[in-house]
């Protein structure tokens, strides 16, 4: 596949950014220790997996991306649209054990160096933000709820520079095979973007939705230039050999870890 995300042993990396001091990527599902399913590289401590497995996977990833896990930050995601400002004081949060810190946070941003923002995914959209000019990075977790409540707009509120200097990467997530019902479709039709561009009616109370397109449209609507938005072709629902899919695997699966950090 011709994509800016390049395969590595346990992750995909946005390779062209490495020379700019940005580490941006997402883990893949294979060659791990977890039974979600067998030999899975699960990165979530909040599912019924052995803590040892997660720690070993973290250590493996830290070595592969050359980013010490003591500098990672992980929030407790709740499918909302709250954004947290992260500093070096937060490094290590929820990495060894889960705590009450950063609870209810589905997006983070920082202007600090040597901080790796991380969150777990298994169909929802990882949205990465960066500006090398202004030394800014952010990461958002946008499922249908986060997309509908415009979590990307909430992140943009914390950007204190011209949006022409901001770049956004929309990472691997479910494809338009993901379906919603009439009630959810009606919610999306209240957004300030044309729902016809990302929702397709397939039958009674059945509508396919492309959450990647929806988030890209929202970002552009709020001032991020189209040419500054990159959307990967990778999809969790189409590439099960690489990714976990909560919906297709009926919840009995692991989670990938999306990450972004800057030197």
From Swiss-Prot:
Q: Which reaction does it catalyse?
A: adenosine + phosphate = alpha-D-ribose 1-phosphate + adenine; S-methyl-5'-thioadenosine + phosphate = 5-(methylsulfanyl)-alpha-D-ribose 1-phosphate + adenine; inosine + phosphate = alpha-D-ribose 1-phosphate + hypoxanthine; adenosine + H2O + H(+) = inosine + NH4(+)
**EC number(s) of the enzyme?**
2.4.2.1, 3.5.4.4, 2.4.2.28
Cofactors needed by this protein, per the record, are: Cu(2+); Zn(2+)
Which residues does Zn(2+) bind?
79, 124, 141
Q: Pfam family of this protein, just one?
A: Cu-oxidase_4
Q: What does the record give under GO molecular function?
A: adenosine deaminase activity; copper ion binding; oxidoreductase activity; S-methyl-5-thioadenosine phosphorylase activity
Q: Which UniProt keywords apply?
A: Copper, Hydrolase, Metal-binding, Oxidoreductase, Transferase, Zinc
The record's SUPFAM superfamilies line, in alphabetical order, gives:
CNF1/YfiH-like putative cysteine hydrolases
Q: From what superkingdom does this record's organism come?
A: Bacteria
Which InterPro entries does the protein's record reference? Cu_polyphenol_OxRdtase, Cu_polyphenol_OxRdtase_sf, Cytotoxic_necrot_fac-like_cat
In which family does this protein belong, per the annotation?
Belongs to the purine nucleoside phosphorylase YfiH/LACC1 family.
Q: What does this protein do?
A: Purine nucleoside enzyme that catalyzes the phosphorolysis of adenosine and inosine nucleosides, yielding D-ribose 1-phosphate and the respective free bases, adenine and hypoxanthine. Also catalyzes the phosphorolysis of S-methyl-5'-thioadenosine into adenine and S-methyl-5-thio-alpha-D-ribose 1-phosphate. Also has adenosine deaminase activity.
**Subunit notes for this chain?**
Homodimer.
Protein name, as recorded: Purine nucleoside phosphorylase SAR1163
């Amino acid at each position: 596949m011709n994509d800016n995300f390049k395969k590595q042993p346990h992750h995909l990396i946005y390779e062209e950014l490495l020379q700019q001091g940005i580490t941006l990527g997402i883990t893949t599902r294979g060659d791990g220790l977890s039974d979600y399913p067998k030999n899975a590289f699960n990165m979530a401590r909040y599912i019924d997996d052995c803590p040892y497995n997660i720690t070993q996977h973290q250590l493996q990833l830290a070595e592969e991306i050359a980013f010490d896990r003591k500098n990672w930050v992980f929030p407790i995601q709740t499918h909302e649209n709250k954004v947290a400002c992260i500093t070096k004081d937060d490094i290590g949060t929820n990495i060894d054990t889960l705590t009450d810190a950063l609870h209810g946070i589905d997006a983070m941003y920082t202007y600090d160096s040597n901080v790796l923002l991380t969150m777990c995914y298994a169909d929802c959209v990882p949205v990465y933000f960066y500006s090398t000019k202004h030394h800014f990075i952010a990461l958002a977790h946008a499922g249908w709820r986060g997309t509908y409540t415009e979590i990307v707009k909430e992140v943009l509120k914390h950007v204190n520079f011209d949006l022409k200097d901001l770049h956004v990467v929309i990472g691997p997530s479910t494809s338009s095979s993901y379906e919603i019902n009439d009630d959810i479709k009606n919610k999306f039709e209240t957004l300030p973007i044309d729902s016809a561009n990302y929702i397709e009616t397939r039958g009674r109370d059945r509508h396919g939705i492309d959450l990647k397109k929806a988030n890209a449209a929202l970002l552009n609507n709020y001032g991020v230039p189209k040419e500054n938005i990159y959307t990967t072709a990778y999809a969790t629902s189409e590439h099960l050999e690489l990714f976990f899919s909560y919906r297709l695997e009926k919840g009995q699966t692991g989670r990938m870890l999306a990450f972004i950090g800057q030197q």
